[in-house]
Amino acid sequence: MASKGGRDKIKLESTAGTGHFYTTTKNKRTMPEKMEIMKFDPVARKHVAYKETKIK
C-alpha cells in the first residue's frame, strides 16, 4: 500500500494580472521554496511568469 502523500496541491497564478491560473502538485520536502515558472497565459496570449499561491 502506498504511503500517504508528500505532495500538496498548489495554484500557479499569472503575474500578468489576467486572473488565469494552473493547478499542479509539488513535493514540499524536496522543494520547500515557492515555485515560479514561465508558462503560457492564453488571456495575455504570451508566456509569462506564474507564481505559486495557496488553493483556497
From Swiss-Prot:
List the biased-composition ranges (Basic and acidic residues): 1-12
Show the Gene3D superfamilies listed in the entry: Ribosomal protein L33
Provide GO CC annotations from the record.
cytosolic large ribosomal subunit
UniProt keywords (A-Z) are: Ribonucleoprotein, Ribosomal protein
Task: Report a single Gene Ontology molecular function.
Answer: structural constituent of ribosome
Annotated region described as Disordered, given as residue ranges: 1-28
The reply to whether Ribosomal protein figures as a keyword in the UniProt entry is yes
- Give the compositionally biased regions (Polar residues): 15-25
The GO biological-process annotations, alphabetized, read as: translation
Q: Does the keyword Ribonucleoprotein apply?
A: yes
Q: Which InterPro entries match?
A: Ribosomal_bL33, Ribosomal_bL33_CS, Ribosomal_bL33_sf, Ribosomal_zn-bd
Q: What is this protein called?
A: Large ribosomal subunit protein bL33
Organism of origin is Cupriavidus necator (strain ATCC 17699 / DSM 428 / KCTC 22496 / NCIMB 10442 / H16 / Stanier 337) (Ralstonia eutropha)
